[in-house]
């Protein structure tokens, strides 16, 4: 990020990263908007109640209602 602060370049950053540097740099949304696919990988099947299990359930619900 220092090279951007020095005016030496640009970078494509995830939205969460942009929130942490708000005010320091200028962000410009890309047109057209694009998204990336995020996958969950685990060696074993998630145990009920574990963070991975809860995240998997959340992802499945978002897919079911058409949010992702």
From Swiss-Prot:
This is Putative protein YfaH. The lineage of its organism: Bacteria, Pseudomonadati, Pseudomonadota, Gammaproteobacteria, Enterobacterales.
